[in-house]
């Protein structure tokens, strides 16, 4: 070869990079100038360390050699030999980045080192920095006096192979083998040439290359890699049996080779081979997916095997997996169209074929399948003919396409035979073509995967292969470059430069985009941080507010608790004061011996704890007294909020309740009612021989008062307030009562009592069970006060004793809500029955009948009793003087209310119209009882607890009235 020709060819690329070289040289000189002066001692020390490093490297001690080279560079940083030798050590250990840095430093010291430029290009090639590798190789060719260096061309061939310029790579590798047939990397070069020939379709040359290196494969590769390449080439040549045997050799050495399993599955799934076995094909493909589930080609072949086995659902799933991994593969979409065609989904098949044609319009099988679809679906023969013609143009040698095109052309030329021939082609064409023509796409599938497998699987292999290339770089070979003599080098260089520039631009754009993305991300992060901080501040503020609210609530709760405690303390103090007052009054008014003997029950009445049957009731009363200001004060206005019927009942039965009355004295009547319950049994035992109406009246009134003390009173705080007003208004009213009508009221009371005695016997049997029922149903009557009041038979039998005894019922009615009367009736009968057990049934009947008539007379007209009571109480007070002035006002007010009520009943005839004359027994009984009541009155007139107990005093008033009449 002409060296002059080589120089003329090299002039053009040299001229293009002269300026760059000059700039680099200037920089190198500037960098080298300050490092030149070294004192002799330093220089000699550096040389000594360099000698030590060379000796260690000769002995094979790389670590000590590297340490010595580092020491040399400390004393002489510009030692080119130390830099290059240390770089060679790093490159031998695959430390290409560190080696490249040292090579660059050596080139700054001496840019004329062509061998260093070549090795630097190889380092950049291993680092996948193709642009810098290309520039380094250019500098090596420029500085070399003889460019015929096999290692240099070996590196250039790898560079072109990485670029994808297979023709230039083939020329570079061929030049290496021409320069040195026994090149140390010859087997690697043959392997690379075999791959290049396979991609170029040069099957025989590829087989020669692979068979040549089969006994001794390149260092990073193994024998089964060569067998795999042989099988791939044989399969591409159509030698199915040889390909199967080659793949089986691979499986003998590597049972988990995913690509080999994939290819074997594809071979066993082909219907035109002798060893056709869909089940084996399925097994091999499933094993391949176990080894590498990310391979889209394996999923594609699996789908085709499922189609052969008519498992269309599994085939669809497999094709879906393949498309998910490689959505731009037209072969996948063609097979999906065939699947839709076989399950008669023609519209979907048309969409799949259309997409495959858009991705690659140069696949003949897709056009053939599209023609079959047109011909079968809607008998679109003209469209089918166009599709067949396009398929025939793309694949002239395809027999199926040519036969189908000829048959369809004959049909169109003979329109009369279209109907006859229409059935045959349509029946024959749809099934075979999609299945038969698809295997022809396999070579296209199997061309590129090998390169990708080698580049991905043997990255370290290529590095090791390149490492073995460079030790021989120092041995120049004097030979001519055939590539330059043929004139291929300028074109190669121009293309390489264009590609390098394009890559540089792409890299610059990518870097700019990366920077922009980084900035955008930084801004987004800053915004996110700001938002997070704002949210944190907001949360902190919300927490602070919540804490403040919680503290405020806690303080409010504490204040409420303190207020409640204060109220409770006040209530306790008031109760203590009341108890002290009661004790003082008891001490100031000692009873005489006769009164204590006759009325020992009244003493027990003030101390209810002495009587065992009544121990529990005072405790209940005290429990209700703990909240006199809260519950009763709140319940007072609730009486006006009741339904109209209940309000009418309240106004009729309790006329005095509508007048404003204080609430502080509410607990008093509860205790006093308890007291009178204890009075009744002892009266019966003291006067067991007397069967009078007064005893029945007293017993019923005491039971009524006991019922007012029942749990219904806490729910109605208003009734407990009425006795307080009765205390203040009773004394002037008693005198008026006696002055106005002393005789008429007594006569009416006695007449009524005698009439009830006659009718009592017939009613006793009916009244007692009613009373028992009312006792058992106390809770239900408490909830329904209106109903209980609407039953006159039961109420009349139970409530009259309150008013048959002196007219206490007028004021008691004001102190008892509508819901308390049914309760009064229930315990009345229950308490009367055990206390009167020693008496005869006649006494019970008289008592109950008297109570019944008096209750009816007083309950109907209570509203008009208040003015009459005032007059009667005033007259009675004048006559009785000192004795009656000290008596409780409520005890004197109730007889007046009963008399006035009876008077008005006679006038209006609303409830009962009975006029019966009194008997002698009744008159005597009234007199005796009046004496007893007078004695009790003197002992209880000043005590606050007895202000609401008018039963016995009323009896005494009745006796006094009778004596006055006599």
UniProtKB/Swiss-Prot annotation:
Residues 467-682 are annotated as: Prion domain (PrD). GO terms for cellular component: nucleus; transcription repressor complex. The modification Phosphoserine is found at residues 429, 710, 741, 768, 815, 817, 866, 943. It is found in: Nucleus. It comes from the Eukaryota. PROSITE patterns: TPR, TPR_REGION. The keyword Membrane does not apply. Residues 12-36, 637-666, 797-808, 826-843, 882-896 have a biased composition (Low complexity). InterPro entries: Corepressor-Demethylase, TPR-like_helical_dom_sf, TPR_rpt. It holds the Pfam family TPR_7. Residues 1-37, 412-489, 631-666, 699-723, 759-966 are annotated as: Disordered. Residues 870-880, 897-906, 924-936 have a biased composition (Basic and acidic residues). Residues 412-429, 439-489, 699-713, 759-780, 814-823, 844-860, 940-950 have a biased composition (Polar residues). [OCT+] is the prion form of CYC8. [OCT+] is the result of a conformational change of the cellular CYC8 protein that becomes self-propagating and infectious. [OCT+]-aggregates sequester soluble CYC8, resulting in increased levels of iso-2-cytochrome c, defects in sporulation and mating, higher levels of invertase derepression and increased flocculation, reminiscent of a partial loss of function of the CYC8-TUP1 corepressor complex. [OCT+] can be cured by GdnHCl and by inactivation of the molecular chaperone HSP104, which is required for [OCT+] propagation. Present with 3890 molecules/cell in log phase SD medium. Associates with TUP1 to form the CYC8-TUP1 (or TUP1-SSN6) corepressor complex that is composed of 4 copies of TUP1 and one copy of CYC8. Interacts with MATALPHA2, CTI6, MIG1, TUP1, SUT1, RFX1, PGD1, HOS1, HOS2 and RPD3. This is General transcriptional corepressor CYC8. It comes from Saccharomyces cerevisiae (strain ATCC 204508 / S288c) (Baker's yeast).
């Amino acid at each position: 070869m002409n060296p002059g020709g080589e120089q003329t060819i090299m002039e053009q690329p040299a001229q293009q990079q002269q300026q760059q070289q000059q700039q680099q040289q200037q920089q190198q000189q500037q960098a080298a100038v300050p490092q030149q002066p070294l004192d002799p001692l330093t220089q000699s020390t550096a040389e000594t360390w360099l000698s030590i490093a060379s000796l260690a490297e000769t002995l094979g001690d790389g670590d000590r050699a590297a340490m010595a080279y580092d020491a040399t560079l400390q004393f002489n940083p510009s030692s080119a030999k130390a830099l290059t030798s240390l770089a060679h050590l790093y490159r031998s250990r695959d430390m290409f980045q560190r080696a490249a840095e040292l090579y660059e430093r050596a080139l700054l010291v001496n840019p004329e080192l062509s061998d260093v430029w070549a090795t630097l290009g190889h380092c950049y090639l291993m680092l996948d920095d193709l642009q810098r590798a290309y520039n380094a190789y250019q500098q090596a060719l420029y500085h070399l006096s003889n460019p015929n260096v096999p290692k240099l061309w070996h590196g250039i061939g790898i560079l072109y192979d990485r670029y994808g310029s297979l023709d230039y790579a083939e020329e570079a590798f061929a030049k290496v083998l021409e320069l040195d047939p026994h090149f140390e990397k010859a087997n690697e070069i043959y392997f690379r040439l075999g791959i290049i020939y396979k991609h170029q379709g040069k099957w025989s040359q590829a087989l020669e290359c692979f068979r040549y290196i089969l006994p001794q494969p390149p260092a990073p590769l193994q024998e089964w890699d060569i067998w795999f390449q042989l099988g791939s080439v044989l399969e591409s040549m159509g030698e199915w049996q040889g390909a199967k045997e080659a793949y089986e050799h691979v499986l003998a050495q590597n049972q988990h080779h995913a690509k080999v399993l994939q290819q074997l599955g594809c071979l066993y799934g082909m219907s035109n081979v002798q060893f056709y076995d869909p089940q084996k094909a399925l097994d091999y493909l499933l094993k391949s997916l176990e080894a590498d589930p990310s391979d889209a080609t394996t999923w594609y072949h699996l789908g085709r095997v499922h189609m052969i086995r008519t498992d269309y659902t599994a085939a669809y799933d497999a094709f879906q997996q393949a498309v998910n991994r490689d959505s731009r593969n037209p072969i996948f979409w063609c097979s999906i169209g065939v699947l839709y065609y076989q399950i008669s989904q023609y519209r979907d098949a048309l969409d799949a074929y259309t997409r495959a044609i858009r991705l690659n319009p140069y696949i003949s099988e897709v056009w053939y399948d599209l023609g079959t679809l047109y011909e079968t679906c809607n008998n679109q023969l003209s469209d089918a003919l166009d599709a067949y013609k396009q398929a025939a143009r793309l694949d002239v040698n395809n027999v199926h396409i040519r036969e189908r095109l000829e048959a369809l052309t004959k049909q169109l030329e003979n329109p009369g035979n279209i109907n006859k021939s229409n059935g045959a082609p349509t029946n024959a064409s749809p099934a075979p073509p999609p299945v038969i023509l698809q295997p022809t796409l396999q070579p296209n599938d199997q061309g590129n995967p090998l390169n990708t497998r080698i580049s991905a699987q043997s990255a370290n292999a290529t590095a090791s292969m390149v490492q073995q290339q460079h030790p021989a770089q120092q041995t120049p070979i004097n030979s001519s470059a055939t590539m330059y003599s043929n004139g291929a080098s300028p074109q190669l260089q121009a293309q390489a430069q264009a590609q390098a520039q394009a890559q540089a631009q792409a890299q610059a754009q990518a870097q700019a985009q990366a920077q922009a993305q980084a900035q955008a991300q930084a801004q987004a992060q800053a915004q996110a941080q700001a938002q997070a901080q704002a949210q944190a501040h907001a949360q902190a503020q919300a927490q602070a507010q919540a804490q403040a609210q919680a503290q405020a609530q806690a303080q409010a709760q504490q204040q409420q608790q303190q207020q409640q405690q204060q109220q409770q303390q006040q209530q306790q103090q008031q109760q203590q004061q009341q108890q002290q007052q009661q004790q003082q009054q008891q001490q100031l008014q000692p009873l005489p011996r006769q009164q204590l003997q006759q009325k020992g029950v009244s003493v027990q009445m003030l101390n209810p704890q002495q009587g065992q049957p009544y121990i529990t009731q005072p405790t209940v009363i005290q429990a209700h007294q703990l909240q006199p200001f809260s519950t009763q004060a709140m319940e007072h206005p609730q009486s006006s909020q009741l339904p109209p019927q209940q309000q009418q009942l309240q106004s009729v039965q309790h006329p005095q309740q509508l007048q404003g009355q204080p609430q502080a004295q509410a607990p008093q009547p509860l205790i006093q009612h308890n007291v009178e319950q204890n009075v009744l049994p002892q009266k019966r035992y003291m006067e067991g021989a007397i069967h009078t109406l007064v005893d029945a009246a007293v017993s019923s009134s005491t039971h009524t008062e006991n019922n007012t003390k029942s749990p219904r009173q806490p729910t109605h705080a208003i009734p407990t307030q009425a006795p307080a007003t009765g205390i203040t208004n009773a004394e002037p009213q008693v005198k008026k009562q006696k002055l106005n009508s002393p005789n008429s009221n007594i006569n009416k009371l006695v007449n009524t009592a005698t009439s009830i005695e006659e009718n009592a016997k017939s009613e006793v049997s009916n009244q007692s069970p009613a009373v028992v029922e009312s006792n058992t149903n106390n809770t239900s009557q408490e909830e329904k006060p209106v109903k209980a009041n609407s039953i006159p038979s039961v109420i009349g039998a139970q409530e009259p004793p309150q008013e048959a005894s002196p007219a206490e019922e007028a004021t008691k009615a004001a102190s008892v809500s509508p819901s308390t009367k049914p309760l009064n009736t229930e315990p009345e009968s229950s308490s009367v029955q055990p206390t009167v057990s020693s008496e005869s049934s006649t006494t019970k009947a008289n008592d109950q009948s008297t109570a019944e008539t008096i209750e009816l007379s007083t309950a109907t007209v209570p509203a008009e009793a208040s003015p009459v009571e005032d007059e009667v109480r005033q007259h009675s007070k004048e006559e009785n003087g000192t004795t009656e002035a000290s008596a409780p006002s409520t005890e004197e007010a109730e007889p007046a209310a009963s008399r006035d009520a009876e008077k008005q009943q006679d006038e209006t005839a609303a409830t009962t119209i009975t006029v019966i004359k009194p008997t002698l027994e009744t008159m005597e009984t009234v007199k005796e009882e009046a004496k007893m009541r007078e004695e009790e009155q003197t002992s209880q007139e000043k005590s606050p607890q007895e202000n609401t107990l008018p039963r016995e005093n009323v009896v005494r008033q009745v006796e006094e009235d009778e004596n006055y009449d006599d």
